[in-house]
């Protein structure tokens, strides 16, 4: 039995609020159960130096957690003077996943800057960030079309992207782990897929106990099922 009482293949309650903030070109509040993340996509003219005069745009992502998004308060990383390795790893994951969904040549020499800010954490913050950011990017691209930054016929989105966590909890594969499950899981895996059914990234780690190829296949099957439900629900 899962602590939440959910079935092994059951997602948490999923809710998306578009235009959650008024300044960003795209903004979404995404909620997976008690995990809540604000995802914004900001459009900035110009590109980094390594993209200058390439005719291509760029997309980058930042990730952070509010000090009391967790059970006990943690210091802001800005106050500590540097980002943790975990934060840097998650930012890179989010950026890779989202760049796989956008035709950078189609946005011209513009940059889309994604910010994912966790306001409440209960497991699955990185996967929620990817899903919410994909929705925010779609809204930002629509803004670019409506405001003459892009031609109305432009279609920079190659696909949408969603992500979910799966794992082995009490010797059983489960979908969409909350904090209680994640902190006690024998295996934790994050899966990122696009709306065409393609796999973008898989991160899987055994926590003190290995997992079999059969268990891996079961977890991947759960992830595919969950992501399909996410696309059907919020995209």
Curated annotation (Swiss-Prot):
Gene3D superfamilies found in the cross-reference section: GHMP Kinase, N-terminal domain
Catalytic activity field: tRNA(n+1) + phosphate = tRNA(n) + a ribonucleoside 5'-diphosphate
Top-level EC class as recorded in UniProt: transferase
Keyword Lyase part of the UniProt annotation: no
A Pfam family this chain is assigned to: RNase_PH
Record family assignment: Belongs to the RNase PH family.
Protein name as catalogued: Ribonuclease PH
Organism for this UniProt entry: Francisella tularensis subsp. holarctica (strain LVS)
């Amino acid at each position: 039995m899962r602590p939440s009482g959910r079935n092994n293949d059951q997602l948490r309650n999923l809710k998306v609020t578009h235009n959650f903030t008024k300044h960003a070109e795209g903004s979404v509040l995404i909620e997976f159960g008690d995990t809540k993340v604000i995802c914004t996509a900001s459009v900035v003219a110009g590109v980094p130096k390594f993209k200058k005069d390439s005719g291509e745009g760029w997309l980058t992502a930042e990730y952070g957690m509010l000090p009391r998004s967790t059970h006990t308060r943690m210091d802001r990383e800005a106050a500590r003077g540097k980002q943790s390795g975990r934060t840097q790893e998650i930012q890179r994951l989010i950026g890779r996943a989202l760049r796989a969904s956008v035709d950078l040549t189609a946005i011209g020499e513009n940059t889309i800057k994604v910010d994912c800010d966790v306001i409440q954490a209960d497991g699955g913050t990185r996967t929620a960030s990817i899903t919410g950011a994909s929705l925010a990017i779609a809204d930002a691209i629509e803004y670019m079309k409506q405001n003459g930054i892009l031609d109305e016929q432009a279609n920079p989105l190659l696909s949408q992207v969603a992500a979910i966590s799966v794992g082995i909890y009490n010797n059983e594969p489960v979908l969409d782990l909350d904090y209680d499950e994640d902190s006690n899981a024998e295996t934790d895996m994050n899966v990122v897929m696009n709306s065409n059914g393609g796999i973008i990234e898989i991160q899987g780690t055994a926590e003190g106990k290995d997992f079999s190829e059969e268990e891996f296949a079961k977890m991947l099957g759960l992830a595919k099922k969950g992501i399909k439900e996410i696309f059907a629900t919020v995209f």
